[in-house]
């Protein structure tokens, strides 16, 4: 049985340690700028919101991001979603995505958005499967081993979620 719980600042090291279990994933996220210091800073920001996927009180996945409040209209920017290898392709990333809406709906959440590397096909499939629509491209945004990769912008309007 699993639980999805709100993450607290004390959870930052558990999340980073989970990523360190897979060196390829850790290398990828470091290319994106997620070192230990940046990761810790994210958890202590005033507008931080994250959810953890727990099995028997052991963290197996998470989503972290920022709550953006403009004139009491709430948006959420997903910065990182991660699932441990043993729990991938079992629907848990989708459960984390749907729980963002459930957790923030009481705060007048209107939109969830993110960016993803254009070569991250599994993530793109996850987002489109969960109703996120591509809204733009940042050309040559990421620099992976001296190769420029586009960033694709995706968003999900909450009114679309309510209709479906």
Predicted regions and their residues:
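Active-site acidic-Proline motif in GNAT/NAT acetyltransferases
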Residues: 84-86, 90, 118-119
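Residues forming the Rossmann-fold NAD(P)(H) cofactor-binding site
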Residues: 94
């Amino acid at each position: 049985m699993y639980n999805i719980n709100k993450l607290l600042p004390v959870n930052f090291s558990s999340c980073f340690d989970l990523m360190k279990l897979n060196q390829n994933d850790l290398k990828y996220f470091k290319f994106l700028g997620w070192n230990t210091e940046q990761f810790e800073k994210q958890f202590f920001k005033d507008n931080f919101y994250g959810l953890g996927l727990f099995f028997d009180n052991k963290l197996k996945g998470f989503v972290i991001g920022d709550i953006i409040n403009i004139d009491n209209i709430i948006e959420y920017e997903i910065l990182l979603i991660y699932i441990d290898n043993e729990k991938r392709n079992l629907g848990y990333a989708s459960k984390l995505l749907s729980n963002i809406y459930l957790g923030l709906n009481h705060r007048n959440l209107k939109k969830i958005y993110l960016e993803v590397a254009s070569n991250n096909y599994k993530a793109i499939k996850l987002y489109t499967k969960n109703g996120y629509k591509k809204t733009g491209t940042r050309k040559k945004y990421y620099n992976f081993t001296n190769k420029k990769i586009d960033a694709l912008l995706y968003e999900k309007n909450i009114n679309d979620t309510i209709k479906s």
